[in-house]
């Protein structure tokens, strides 16, 4: 029976892996009037039907044909006719939910209507995404390498039900387009990761995630070592793979590999890349003495736009080698290590099995607006491979949207797209079965019967294998941490804490114990509970804390990762957490200068996390329990279990779950109606923390006098006190004028920080400036309210920095 199941399973995998992709949606629109339906490849193009045109199409546009055909190589379809726009013009395409290829065809020349594309500039949007801004097709083709007279711009956009494509001519200009192509793609084709379902985040220890609100632009797609692969020879998505013979390559040889037998798999189906791509490659050469290859790299240079993140997909295939450790090399992107050990045979499981890996890298503007993204392959010698060689078959590079904008970096925050589908995705299923034993596979098969049971068995088995792979990836990260930090055994922690006898704190995460190292230094040891998700929290905390070094950030001294035992060792802080301090020291909590010093230190710590680290760290759980105080009442931010790492230029984050603590969690984290989640979420939590520090004692008094106050939104009556100028009594009758101004300044800063719309909140840079500056320089903020309208989200007040750095 088991053999039969495995046979059928392998048959299903084989069929699905080798089957070509058939897109659900295909639109080929030849814009303007034409009687020629077929292009050079035999594909059928249609004219613009009324159902996709706007009602004002006659007034907003007109059609025209080229004055004369300048180049014999320019195809008749779709380049000889064009739709020319006088004003904003929106096509509406009914499509199924999911990501779509959008290809725009341009032939910048003169047209019989008198229109000359030389003077044409246009901005293009799809739903909430800006794809092009003040774009000139004429200037683009003149700067193209290799030289070309026509142009195709390819984008990948997520769409719910309707793809609204808008062309907006620039001032005193007309706009045009010759052809529009829309093609669907397999679910999460560019968002789930490579064959291993991972996107390696170059320069970070945390894998990158692409959510359903991310658009991209294809900037390079290469058939490495071979000729161009045109649309009809792709694997069903009509992609064009260019040769890498131009400025992309430095060094290497391109061997001829005839009659290649490619064994596609479920991990790398046939639609990932056509056989033409895996049939060609570039290698380093020097076959007689590969030791010479240690003197140089196999290198490509790709011109890209600065200020964006890029998804780099690399395709690999080994035909002639058949054992692991024959060819092992390292991959570098942007002069950073992307993968230390790349052994195609070891990863794929055998010869003639294609695989592909995904990497994400941010390209800054240090080298100008159009820098080169460098890709290097170099032999790895430490494992003593049989050949000192490297190989590459294909490259795809996608520019990822920056807060909804693929054209330029802008500050305004955009509304999120609706979800792609209400159906469960494989990720949802993984969450449901996480932590279950393998007996679940047998139970499901028996429960639903042999027919549907086999299909369910296959799906669950694949998901279980994916989960095991992610578990192995976490263990690989721990090995990396061992090189940077002290790693303690559980027995050593038991000795340090004297059998965990001294408890200094408890929480939902676990218990914190006091202890002493062998040199006498006091430490705190946080032992995590053995709960679902705690491994991910542990990885987050170690990864975040290992990158920090600041007086207002708790110092990580080491960790333990032993089976199910996980613990973090950090410096011991004598005064415990801020909430413990405030409950123990009522007299000190009335000292305005003490509270101000603590608040300013916390602000500086958050400023460092957002702007001082190489990789921005968003904490997501700022609250009194996570602020520790040393003997001098110097505050230190701690507990990074919910933290998220991202590049500093990324103003918008992707969250798969709600994270934070009620009372301090930013509204956009649990409801997208308030805006997009970003580092501004920490700003909100800081504001609530400051107001809590200033108003905690006042809140107790008010609730004693008026029980109805407990049901009032806390900042409401704080704001009323600020308006009435009666906040003195919070600290008693003996408060000085200077202390009164400090208290008022803290309240004003706190109220600015808790504005419901993230774009209205100051950055932590600005918060520190406000805290250190004078009260007179501060404006009174609008009254925060959780009941906001759409207009509030789209507007910004005088302290807004648009969701980005100031």
From Swiss-Prot:
GO terms for molecular function: ATP binding; protein serine/threonine kinase activity. The keyword Membrane applies. Its EC number is 2.7.11.-. SMART domains: S_TKc. It is an enzyme of class 2 (transferase). Residues 465-806 are cytoplasmic. ATP binds at residues 504-512, 526. The active site is at residue 621. Residues 498-775 form the Protein kinase domain. Residues 18-443 are extracellular. One of its GO terms (cellular component) is membrane. This is Probable receptor-like protein kinase At5g39030. It comes from Arabidopsis thaliana.
């Amino acid at each position: 029976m088991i053999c039969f199941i495995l046979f059928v399973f392998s048959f299903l995998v084989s069929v699905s892996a080798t089957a070509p992709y058939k897109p659900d949606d295909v639109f080929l629109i030849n814009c303007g009037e034409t009687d020629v339906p077929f292009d050079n490849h035999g594909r059928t193009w249609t004219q613009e039907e009324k159902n996709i045109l706007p009602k004002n199409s006659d007034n907003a546009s007109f059609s025209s044909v080229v004055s004369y055909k300048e180049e014999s190589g320019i195809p008749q379809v779709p380049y000889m006719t064009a739709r020319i726009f006088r004003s904003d013009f929106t096509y509406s395409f009914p499509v199924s939910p999911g990501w779509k290829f959008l290809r725009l065809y341009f032939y910048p020349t003169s047209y019989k209507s008198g229109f000359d594309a030389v003077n044409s500039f246009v901005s293009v949007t799809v739903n909430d995404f800006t794809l092009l801004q003040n774009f000139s097709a004429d200037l683009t083709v003149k700067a193209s390498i290799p030289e070309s007279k026509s142009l195709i711009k390819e984008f990948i956009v997520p769409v719910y039900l309707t793809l609204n494509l808008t062309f907006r001519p620039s001032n005193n200009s007309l706009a045009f387009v010759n052809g529009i192509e829309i093609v669907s793609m397999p679910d999460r084709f560019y968002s789930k990761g490579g064959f291993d379902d991972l996107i390696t985040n170059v320069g970070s220890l945390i894998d990158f995630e692409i959510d359903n609100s991310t658009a991209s632009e294809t900037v390079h797609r290469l058939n490495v070592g071979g000729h161009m692969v045109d649309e009809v020879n792709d694997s069903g998505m009509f992609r064009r793979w260019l040769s890498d013979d131009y400025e992309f390559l430095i060094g290497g040889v391109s061997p001829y590999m005839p009659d290649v037998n490619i064994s596609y798999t479920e991990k790398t189906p046939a639609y990932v890349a056509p056989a033409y791509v895996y049939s060609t490659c570039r290698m380093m050469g020097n076959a007689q003495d590969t030791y010479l290859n240690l003197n140089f790299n196999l290198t490509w240079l790709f011109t890209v736009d600065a200020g964006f993140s890029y998804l780099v997909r690399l395709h690999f295939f080994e035909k002639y080698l058949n054992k692991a450790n024959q060819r092992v090399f390292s991959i570098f992107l942007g002069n950073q290590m992307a993968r230390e050990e790349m052994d195609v045979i070891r990863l794929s499981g055998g010869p003639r099995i294609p695989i592909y890996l995904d990497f994400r890298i941010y390209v800054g503007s240090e080298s100008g607006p159009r820098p080169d993204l460098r890709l290097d392959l170099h032999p790895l010698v430490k494992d003593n491979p049989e050949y000192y060689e490297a190989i590459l078959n294909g490259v795809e590079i996608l520019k990822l949207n920056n807060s909804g904008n693929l054209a330029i970096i802008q500050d305004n925050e955009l509304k999120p797209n609706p979800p792609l589908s209400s159906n469960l995705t494989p990720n949802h299923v993984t969450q449901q079965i996480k932590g279950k034993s393998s007996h679940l596979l047998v139970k499901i098969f028996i429960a639903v019967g042999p027919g549907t049971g086999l299909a369910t068995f296959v799906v669950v088995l694949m998901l279980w294998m994916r989960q095991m792979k992610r578990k192995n990836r976490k263990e690989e990260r721990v090995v990396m941490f061992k090189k940077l930090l002290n790693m303690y055994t559980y027995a050593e922690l038991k000795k340090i804490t004297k059998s965990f006898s001294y408890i200094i704190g408890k929480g939902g995460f676990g218990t914190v114990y006091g202890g002493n190292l062998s040199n006498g230094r006091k430490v705190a040891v946080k032992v995590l509970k053995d709960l679902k998700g705690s491994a991910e929290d542990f990885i987050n905390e170690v990864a975040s804390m290992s990158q920090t070094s600041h007086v207002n950030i708790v110092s990580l001294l080491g960790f333990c990762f032993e089976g199910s035992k996980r613990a973090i060792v950090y410096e011991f802080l004598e005064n415990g957490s801020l909430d413990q301090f405030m409950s123990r020291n009522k007299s000190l909590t009335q000292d305005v200068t003490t509270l101000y010093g603590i608040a300013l230190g916390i602000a500086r710590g958050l400023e460092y996390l957002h702007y001082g680290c190489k990789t921005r760290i968003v904490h997501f759980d700022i609250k009194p329990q996570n602020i520790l105080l040393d003997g001098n009442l110097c505050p230190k931010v701690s507990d990074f279990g919910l933290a998220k790492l991202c590049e500093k230029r990324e103003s918008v984050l992707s969250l798969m779950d709600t994270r934070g603590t009620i009372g301090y969690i930013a509204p956009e984290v649990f409801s997208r109606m308030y805006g997009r989640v970003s580092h501004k979420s920490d700003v909100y939590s800081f504001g609530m923390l400051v107001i809590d520090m200033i108003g905690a004692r006042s809140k107790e008094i008010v609730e004693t006098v008026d029980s109805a106050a407990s049901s009032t939104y806390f900042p409401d009556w704080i704001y009323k006190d600020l308006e009435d100028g009666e906040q003195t009594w919070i600290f008693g009758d003996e408060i000085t004028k200077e202390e009164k101004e400090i208290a008022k300044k803290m309240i004003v800063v706190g109220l600015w920080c808790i504005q419901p719309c993230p774009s209205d909140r100051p950055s932590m840079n600005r918060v520190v400036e406000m805290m250190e500056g004078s009260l007179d320089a501060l404006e009174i903020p609008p009254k925060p309210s959780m009941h906001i309208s759409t207009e509030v989200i789209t507007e910004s007040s005088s302290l807004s920095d648009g969701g980005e750095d100031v």
